[in-house]
Amino acid sequence: MVFNRYALITNCNHKTLGLYYLWFSFLFGIYGFLLSVILRTELYSSSLRIIAQENVNLYNMIFTVHGIIMIFFNIMPGLFGGFGNYYLPILCGSSELAYPRINSISLLLQPIAFILVILSTAAEFGGGTGWTWYPPLSTSLMSLSPVAVDVIVIGLLVSGIASIMSSLNFLTTVMHLRAKGLTLGILSVSTWSLIITSIMLLLTLPVLTGGVLMLLSDLHFNTLFFDPTFAGDPILYQHLLWFFGHPEVYILILPAFGIISHVISTNYSRSLFGNQSMILAMGCIAVLGSVVWVHHMYTTGLEVDTRAFFTSTTILISIPTGTKVFNWLCTYMSTNFGITHSSSLLSLLFICTFTFGGTTGVILGNGAIDVALHDTYYVIAHFHFVLSIGAIIALFTSVSFFQESFFGKTLRENTIIVLWSILFFVGVVLTFLPMHFLGFNVMPRRIPDYPDALNGWNMICSIGSTMTLFGLLIFK
């Protein structure tokens, strides 16, 4: 009985820890989503609505915390931590992960990191820097509360330590605890997605850690790494951040690829079309995704040759990504086109939204076009189509598909589940599709006010956000 009471801090079973990851992801995600509802409530009409003129920095603080929570505390614990912990040992034929106690510690670090990030909102001005924490704003003692930046950075360092421990755990399990005769070549796409994600985390997280530690030392110890007055370079920080920041996008979406591949293959009783090419495509995405970080920085005064190189490599990523979409559709086309399960419907919705988000990414990857669209709502629409719709739908797909394993019972495949799927999908599309048009009208992101001419599109976005909220309320 005592152990049941303290199961969170005493249990080392990989399935139990995976479920805890999913619950944490769900709870943290609700908090982050409600912050986005506040943003859309503010933006439903021009002029300031619910945020007072003298407290407009609250808007900056809300979108900063929203971004950090949804990336580091919703999608990563859900897809990488939850799905990975629960199913990686099973897919490898192992009874347990290599280091169960380290696995337990990495889980316990997640709520600690979350609380630290939330504490930043209690500071006088909050840490309204955006989730990218660009200097000189984040290193200025004049405009923000230094303690808010401190707790955000420390929270992210704690979260990074947890992610690195999980990655080492997964890789060690795959390399040394596989079932006899199960070679790397015959591992499933889902397993390979977690292997590649773990490798990317191990290669890129140390760079982010170095960058934010330099940021902290600039803030408190006068090191002047990023102060151009004393021969520092704020662009150096952008390189360090985005060297992690762009692979992070693929770290978030690769486990989703594994889940969707598994769901489509199992629901339709078909082996995945081009199974080995799917694994190769994920490897290509990981390699190319690690050398395109400068496409976030086209407006920082790059040389033409540099922009040409990063434009080419960015657009090149569409080839392996297109391979994956093609193979998913070919697997689906070899069936009788039926929707056998709610997870089948969700996986098809994922393919549609991910394809659309990837198409807008090809447009943004062009160095000439991005100069016009940089920091507009077009960028927000692009990455929310891939992450907010794509990765989150993949998370719901996994919960729907593995519900019997996770919860010990199966929900009835009744009308309300289909209605929820459609309501949620229509809500998020209605939220983010009009943002492309706002971007073409050059509405800048991170600004709480805008011209009256843009009222129509913004009102549609806010209606979509409300629909999504109602959709989540009926999610079982």
UniProtKB/Swiss-Prot annotation:
Recorded hits in InterPro entries, A to Z, give: Cyt_c_oxase-like_su1_dom, Cyt_c_oxase-like_su1_sf, Cyt_C_Oxase_1, Cyt_c_Oxase_su1_BS
Q: Which species is this record about?
A: Plasmodium chabaudi
Subcellular location as annotated: Mitochondrion inner membrane
Q: What class of enzyme is it?
A: translocase
Catalytic reactions on record: 4 Fe(II)-[cytochrome c] + O2 + 8 H(+)(in) = 4 Fe(III)-[cytochrome c] + 2 H2O + 4 H(+)(out)
Give the record's cofactor note, including how many are bound: Binds 2 heme A groups non-covalently per subunit. Binds a copper B center.
Membrane topology field: Multi-pass membrane protein
Keyword DNA-binding, does the record have it? no
Tell me what gene encodes this.
COI
Name-wise, this protein is Cytochrome c oxidase subunit 1
Identify the metabolic or biological route this protein is part of.
Answer: Energy metabolism; oxidative phosphorylation
Enzyme Commission (EC) number? 7.1.1.9
PANTHER family reported in the protein's UniProt record: CYTOCHROME C OXIDASE SUBUNIT 1
Domain of life where this protein originates: Eukaryota
**Is Transferase one of the keywords UniProt gives this record?**
no
* Family under the similarity heading: Belongs to the heme-copper respiratory oxidase family.
**Which residues are listed for Ca(2+) binding in this entry?**
E42, P448
SUPFAM superfamilies from the UniProt entry: Cytochrome c oxidase subunit I-like
The entry marks the following residues as binding heme a3, namely H382
Cross-linked sites for 1'-histidyl-3'-tyrosine (His-Tyr)? H246-Y250
Task: List positions binding Cu cation.
Answer: H246, H295, H296
Binding positions for Fe(II)-heme a?
H66, H384
Pfam families named among the record's database cross-references: COX1
